[in-house]
Amino acid sequence: MVGYSDLKGNPLWVVYKLTPPQENAPHLKRPDNFSADWRNLGLITSTDYTNSGYDRGHMAPNHAIALLYGKEAQQETFLMTNITPQRASLNQKIWQRLEEIELESFAPKFKVLWVYTGPLFDLKTTHLKSSYFVDIPNAFYKIYVGLEASGAIKVLAFIVPQNAKANDRLQKYLVSIDEVERRSGFDFLHQLDDKIEDALEKEIDTTSWF
């Protein structure tokens, strides 16, 4: 599920569900091309990123979605409405590491793992030199909501800046969900009871995760 902004040329939030991957799940070939999304009024295309100095960064990850949901779902991760500008040093290093950990380490700990992710912007934003219609985020967030077999809910959140170093420890970028909400303007766990929501959103507890 994607919440897309035509004004920023970015997905503002993306939600996907992870479950423990099956050992015999097929590893699908990565699609060759990114595709424009006809629902996008600005019709951002892959060429908007050409020679921009930024990678076409997936929010819903190609590998995990392909592994769990198959080829058609994988191809949807290559729609430009799932793509945001990421520095190569982020996209191909620490962000990729976080995507690997969420699938291989976090998901097996829970019955179901929900992931909320998206870009964060400064008040004064710049756009790609190759496209006036695509704003450049200064950071990205990930919120994990894990449902245990007992029914207990565990949460974890990160904000990772564009200039994060490849060998940084992920724990360096741990934040509360409250902090993600403050910077994004979104209310992520509003469907929960208010007391439970308040308690989960202010905590930074890695006990069930690392």
Language model segments and positions:
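Short, His- and charge-rich active-site/binding loops that engage polyanionic ligands
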Residues: 1-56
